[in-house]
Amino acid sequence: MAGDGRRAEAVREGWGVYVTPRAPIREGRGRLAPQNGGSSDAPAYRTPPSRQGRREVRFSDEPPEVYGDFEPLVAKERSPVGKRTRLEEFRSDSAKEEVRESAYYLRSRQRRQPRPQETEEMKTRRTTRLQQQHSEQPPLQPSPVMTRRGLRDSHSSEEDEASSQTDLSQTISKKTVRSIQEAPVSEDLVIRLRRPPLRYPRYEATSVQQKVNFSEEGETEEDDQDSSHSSVTTVKARSRDSDESGDKTTRSSSQYIESFWQSSQSQNFTAHDKQPSVLSSGYQKTPQEWAPQTARIRTRMQNDSILKSELGNQSPSTSSRQVTGQPQNASFVKRNRWWLLPLIAALASGSFWFFSTPEVETTAVQEFQNQMNQLKNKYQGQDEKLWKRSQTFLEKHLNSSHPRSQPAILLLTAARDAEEALRCLSEQIADAYSSFRSVRAIRIDGTDKATQDSDTVKLEVDQELSNGFKNGQNAAVVHRFESFPAGSTLIFYKYCDHENAAFKDVALVLTVLLEEETLGTSLGLKEVEEKVRDFLKVKFTNSNTPNSYNHMDPDKLNGLWSRISHLVLPVQPENALKRGICL
């Protein structure tokens, strides 16, 4: 029967002797290649194409020998005689012992950790061999004339000594090496995605932390000594070799990469070999705790090797250049101190000007207030509105920011009985405005120019005002504005404009003498303003005046009035005044 045939065939094959016979799941199915990981000849049965293959698990008193990725490829091929080659012939003794002692889990194979005893023995053999080599023969230093061909010679003792750690690391079994190389990388990536472990009780966490710190410190010191010695030896030998060959750039880069690889490989083996010793101290470390420590130690050793190689290749001229650079910088700073003095002086003067400007303005305002108080005491017949409005208007202009937006225009008017008071008061108010500068205000009299040509008067007025303002005078008095030729008054567009005035930091005081004998004190400021406007309109415009750009017309007069009528104040007569003498 089919069951007997399979039983007989199982007797002939390797570990099939230990398999307990079992009836097939389905009859009439052909036999296929093993599907249990590629390491056994357990019979399996064909499955329909639409379904995935199912593995059959058989248990016995002694589990069969199962190998995963490390099964030799020769075992899968049939021998010429027709029998399958026994797997034990291709395995080392150590591997056979590991397999016999391991548990058989076909569906979920866990990653095996190397036993602490074997790892300690392997570390002892390597340490003993290194000590014997150092005791028998001191480390040879490669001579400067050694060539690359001599280094590559397999019979030279220098190469054997330089690559001793690499040969020792190769004696480890293939399975152990692969687990060492794969563990840090895979655990590194997975650990970052895992949650941190639960907290331990305080007394347990304290004891565990002390043990781990003590063991980690010991391992780090030993790893520093071993890997630093190997990295320094390799870098020195190869840097001397590259000096003779002539290709410094290409070979130094290759040496740099190889030294990186050797230091990292030796660090991996050393750290993994010492893992069981730490585990045997009473606390088993999880992979989450081992991976950060391994990466941290490996990074430290790579940095040490890089630093030493850079120090070895650095020329003395570079270091001396760094030392001598400090005095040069010091002398450079001392020499540049003299250039800082003019800069400091400029900053000091600028700050002095910035902070002194408000003081100057404050002093100018105070001086103007003192002068106005004196005038108020002299001209006691004037209305209180005259003093209050004029002083406030001019103080505001003095306190305004620099540059000022527009000039200050003040228009004073009076009747025939107050002609002398109008003349004296207008001049003294203008002088009070410029009293801080200790200069007199510009004086222009319209009665002297009444019979002159309009264009000539315009030119003369322009020259007097512009020259005076350019020479430091900041105030001007224009007497008898109504006596100017009508066309000549258009020049005041230039000096009285709200936005485009030629000089904005100045004050102009204009006077208009009305034809009335007296000006009542009961009139308001609005009524006085309208009276002056009507009077100027009669004086400057008539039906016989031609319409031209240099002749006055109602439109031009309206524009001029809007520029000179900022503040219109009446002046009353003073009985104490004598003719031609001001108070």
Swiss-Prot record:
<feature type="compositionally biased region" description="Polar residues">
    <location>
        <begin position="277"/>
        <end position="287"/>
    </location>
</feature>
<keyword id="KW-0175">Coiled coil</keyword>
<dbReference type="Pfam" id="PF05609">
    <property type="entry name" value="LAP1_C"/>
</dbReference>
<feature type="compositionally biased region" description="Polar residues">
    <location>
        <begin position="165"/>
        <end position="174"/>
    </location>
</feature>
<protein>
    <recommendedName>
        <fullName>Torsin-1A-interacting protein 1</fullName>
    </recommendedName>
</protein>
<feature type="modified residue" description="Phosphoserine">
    <location>
        <position position="186"/>
    </location>
</feature>
<feature type="modified residue" description="Phosphoserine">
    <location>
        <position position="242"/>
    </location>
</feature>
<dbReference type="GO" id="GO:0001671">
    <property type="term" value="F:ATPase activator activity"/>
</dbReference>
<keyword id="KW-1133">Transmembrane helix</keyword>
<feature type="compositionally biased region" description="Basic and acidic residues">
    <location>
        <begin position="74"/>
        <end position="101"/>
    </location>
</feature>
<feature type="compositionally biased region" description="Basic and acidic residues">
    <location>
        <begin position="1"/>
        <end position="12"/>
    </location>
</feature>
<dbReference type="GO" id="GO:0005634">
    <property type="term" value="C:nucleus"/>
</dbReference>
<feature type="modified residue" description="Phosphoserine">
    <location>
        <position position="156"/>
    </location>
</feature>
<dbReference type="GO" id="GO:0032781">
    <property type="term" value="P:positive regulation of ATP-dependent activity"/>
</dbReference>
<feature type="region of interest" description="Disordered">
    <location>
        <begin position="309"/>
        <end position="328"/>
    </location>
</feature>
<feature type="compositionally biased region" description="Basic and acidic residues">
    <location>
        <begin position="238"/>
        <end position="250"/>
    </location>
</feature>
<feature type="region of interest" description="Interaction with TOR1A">
    <location>
        <begin position="356"/>
        <end position="583"/>
    </location>
</feature>
<dbReference type="GO" id="GO:0051117">
    <property type="term" value="F:ATPase binding"/>
</dbReference>
<feature type="modified residue" description="Phosphoserine">
    <location>
        <position position="305"/>
    </location>
</feature>
<feature type="modified residue" description="Phosphoserine">
    <location>
        <position position="230"/>
    </location>
</feature>
<feature type="modified residue" description="Methionine sulfoxide">
    <location>
        <position position="301"/>
    </location>
</feature>
<feature type="modified residue" description="Phosphoserine">
    <location>
        <position position="309"/>
    </location>
</feature>
<feature type="modified residue" description="Phosphoserine">
    <location>
        <position position="157"/>
    </location>
</feature>
<keyword id="KW-0325">Glycoprotein</keyword>
<feature type="modified residue" description="Methionine sulfoxide">
    <location>
        <position position="146"/>
    </location>
</feature>
<feature type="modified residue" description="Phosphoserine">
    <location>
        <position position="227"/>
    </location>
</feature>
<dbReference type="GO" id="GO:0008092">
    <property type="term" value="F:cytoskeletal protein binding"/>
</dbReference>
<dbReference type="InterPro" id="IPR046754">
    <property type="entry name" value="TOIP1/2_N"/>
</dbReference>
<feature type="modified residue" description="Phosphoserine">
    <location>
        <position position="154"/>
    </location>
</feature>
<feature type="transmembrane region" description="Helical">
    <location>
        <begin position="339"/>
        <end position="355"/>
    </location>
</feature>
<keyword id="KW-1017">Isopeptide bond</keyword>
<feature type="modified residue" description="Phosphoserine">
    <location>
        <position position="315"/>
    </location>
</feature>
<feature type="topological domain" description="Nuclear">
    <location>
        <begin position="1"/>
        <end position="338"/>
    </location>
</feature>
<feature type="modified residue" description="Phosphothreonine">
    <location>
        <position position="220"/>
    </location>
</feature>
<comment type="subunit">
    <text>Interacts with ATP1B4. Interacts with TOR1A (ATP-bound). Interacts with TOR1B, TOR2A and TOR3A. Interacts with VIM.</text>
</comment>
<dbReference type="Pfam" id="PF20443">
    <property type="entry name" value="LAP1_N"/>
</dbReference>
<keyword id="KW-0539">Nucleus</keyword>
<dbReference type="GO" id="GO:0090435">
    <property type="term" value="P:protein localization to nuclear envelope"/>
</dbReference>
<dbReference type="GO" id="GO:0005637">
    <property type="term" value="C:nuclear inner membrane"/>
</dbReference>
<dbReference type="GO" id="GO:0005635">
    <property type="term" value="C:nuclear envelope"/>
</dbReference>
<keyword id="KW-0597">Phosphoprotein</keyword>
<feature type="cross-link" description="Glycyl lysine isopeptide (Lys-Gly) (interchain with G-Cter in SUMO2)">
    <location>
        <position position="308"/>
    </location>
</feature>
